Amino acid sequence: MPKRYREGALDAKLRSERTRSEAKLLHKAKLAGVLCPTVLEVGEFEITMSFVDGTRPEMDSKESREAGRMLAKLHEADIIHGDYTPANIIRSGESGALYVIDFGLGFVSKDVEDKAVDVFTMLRAIAEKDAFVAGYCSYGKADEVLKRVKDVEKRVRYAV
């Protein structure tokens, strides 16, 4: 959506770059083994992708563990989701598999801090934290990231 508060040419450039970036992240996530919508076409300001018919998961223990595994795969590929919460996961009505959606705030980064913020964001949103962490531990550098999550948590508590 165009932003009226931004100068027209700048707005068009930003929206176009963000559209291409999201499409690339979706493709990269799929290559990393993460279930997500398939990009069918990329226009200047829109992405046409496959439709995942389903519902938001309850994030029980099993789903939380799987969400942790999926984030581990994203982080192995240095993909930062940017808004990794249950609202951006869909349980397929057909297969029951979990799909990650909405990479609009995502980016590529090797930075442990960026990965820790992704983990922290999900941990704040779910009850089954231990299951999520158990799934995330399939990431080779999970210990380093989880240690940083504690630092992020302290900063957030202090800021509030």
Regions found by a protein language model. Name each.
Residues 1, 41, 50-51, 102:
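Residue-level recognition of conserved beta-strand positions in structured domain cores
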Residues 24-42:
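Conserved HxN/HPN-centered segment at the entrance to the catalytic loop
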Residues 44-56:
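Conserved short submotifs of the Hanks-type protein kinase catalytic core
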Residues 16-19, 61, 113-116:
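Short, conserved loop/turn and helix-capping segments at secondary-structure boundaries
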Residues 98-160:
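C-lobe/activation-segment region of protein kinase-like
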